């Protein structure tokens, strides 16, 4: 009798795992297919638009190590600017220097300000950089570009996997978006972490779409 119960539980567990894996796989594939033909590795192939949207990143990881993804996103955004593919860059991220209780966060970062400094160092005119402090999620960055800044088209700058997800979110708002891919980190640990994080983020994307999650913004538009 006990053996029969164990077998039944194992069967149900196996079915649950299979269903979960199928859902995760479907979310991943759907995001990739949707962005097909709209992500670019060659800056010369990127269609010119007025605005670029640089998705939030910090120069330092939560472990206190240098973040290669930050360097590569800044490089990609500067390439777009210097190639005259975008005129303005929205540096969208969050200020993570303090937690919800106001305590200083070890290795915390003011992402928009750090991105601004790095972009200026890369030769981007400071008057062509817009700081967005409400980009604490990709959804918020994309939604604000459309709903607050009033954009109807944008070049998104991040790594390939991130760009594809952001494009799917842009489609929801009728915002025409393409992605310019920053070079991914070559470190094996980063690849594993980013893949796991992206897998969960893509599932969360479709949960947000299903339930109609809508961010609310406090700041007024400040763009050219």
What are these regions (language model features)?
Residues 2-44:
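N-terminal type II signal-anchor transmembrane helix
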Residues 3-4, 69, 198:
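General helical secondary-structure elements
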Residues 29-195:
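A structural signal for short, hydrophobic/glycine-enriched beta-strand patches
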Residues 52, 213-224:
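Short linear elements at protein peripheries
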Residues 96-101, 178-181, 200-208, 223-224:
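A general structural signal for short secondary-structure boundary/capping elements
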Residues 192-214:
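A transmembrane-helix-recognition feature enriched in membrane-embedded lipid enzymes
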């Amino acid at each position: 009798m006990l053996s029969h119960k164990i077998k039944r539980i194992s069967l149900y567990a196996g079915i649950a795992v299979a269903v979960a894996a199928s859902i995760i796989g479907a979310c991943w594939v759907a995001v990739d297919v949707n962005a097909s033909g709209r992500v670019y590795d060659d800056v010369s192939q990127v269609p010119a638009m007025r605005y670029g949207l640089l998705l939030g990143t910090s120069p330092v990881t939560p472990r206190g190590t240098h973040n290669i993804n930050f360097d590569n996103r800044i490089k990609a955004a500067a390439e777009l600017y210097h190639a005259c593919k975008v005129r303005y860059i929205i540096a969208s991220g969050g200020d993570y220097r303090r937690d919800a209780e106001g305590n200083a966060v070890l290795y915390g970062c003011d992402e928009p300000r750090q991105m601004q400094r790095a972009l200026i160092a890369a030769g981007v005119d400071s008057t062509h950089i817009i700081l967005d402090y409400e980009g604490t999620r990709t959804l918020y960055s994309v939604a604000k570009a459309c709903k607050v800044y009033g954009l109807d088209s944008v070049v998104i700058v991040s790594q390939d996997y991130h760009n594809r997800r952001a494009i799917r979110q842009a489609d929801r708002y009728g915002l025409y978006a393409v992605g310019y891919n920053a070079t991914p980190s070559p470190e094996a640990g980063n690849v594993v972490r980013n893949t796991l994080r992206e897998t969960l983020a893509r599932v969360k994307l479709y949960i947000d779409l299903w339930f109609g999650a809508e961010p609310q913004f406090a700041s007024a538009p400040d763009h050219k």
